[in-house]
Design a protein with these regions (language model features):
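Residue-level detector of high-confidence beta-strand sites
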Residues: 57, 130-132
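A conserved beta-strand-loop-helix scaffold within acyl/acetyltransferase catalytic domains
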Residues: 6-9, 14-78
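Short glycine/proline-centered loop/turn elements that form peptide/ligand docking sites
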Residues: 93, 116-117, 137-140
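Alpha-helical elements of the RecA-like P-loop NTPase motor core of helicases
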Residues: 15, 118-119
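Conserved active-site tyrosine of GNAT-family acetyltransferases
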Residues: 121-127
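Intrinsically disordered, low-complexity, positively biased terminal segments
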Residues: 1-2, 135-185
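Conserved GNAT acetyl-CoA-binding A-motif
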Residues: 100-113
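Conserved acetyl-CoA-binding loop-helix of GNAT-fold acetyltransferases
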Residues: 79, 85-100
């Protein structure tokens, strides 16, 4: 199997990103198209390539503000079946976090798709539980509210807490238990 190479996404990657998204998550074309229309920018996504196609992807979406601190959200981390176990998602996640911090974001959060992934986000990306799923607290741009409406109600199958990692020196104490409404779950 070919060596993995990592880079930022490009406009021309959208068909392959869509293919990988459908393959891993099974979402329909309307949902994926709405995400790309509402929230995606090439610089928000990192990919791994191998064998001439995308092997893994992850998105880090800036925009939320929690008690005056800028936040970003890791979303849709996905690795194609043949490339799993090669640490592609971990490397993409770490690069997304580093890029967010380099751009001035104070903390990066995510809502794991299922309880079993919480340990992965803790051990691989250094995240810990911080925000409550749903409810008031964190402020979001209008585009996030629009995509959240497209997503519908929160899934009872996702964890009740979002996991996060702060930039060095950021105190997360005042944020503990703050509500994070726009989870796209």
């Amino acid at each position: 199997m070919s060596e993995l190479s990592f880079r930022l996404s490009r406009e021309r990657d959208v068909p392959e990103l869509t293919r990988l998204w459908r393959e891993v998550f099974g979402d329909d074309e309307d949902f994926i198209s709405e995400f790309f229309r509402s929230l995606w920018r090439p610089e928000y996504c990192r990919v791994a390539e191998a064998d001439g196609k995308l092997a893994a992807m992850g998105f880090c979406l800036p925009g939320p503000v929690a008690n005056g601190l800028s936040c970003a959200y890791i979303y849709a981390m996905a690795t194609a079946e043949p490339y799993r176990g090669r640490c592609a998602a971990q490397r993409i996640g770490l690069e997304l976090i580093r890029g967010a911090f380099d751009s001035g974001v104070h903390l990066v959060a995510t809502l794991p798709a299922e309880e079993s992934l919480c340990r992965w986000y803790e051990s691989r990306l250094g995240m810990a539980p911080l925000f409550r799923k749903g409810g008031p607290g964190v402020e979001f741009p209008q585009s996030w509210h629009e995509f959240s409406r497209f997503c519908g109600e929160h899934s009872p199958e996702t964890p009740d807490m979002l996991w996060a990692i702060p930039a060095p020196g950021v105190d997360t104490g005042p944020l503990r238990g703050l509500g994070w409404e726009c989870c796209f779950d």
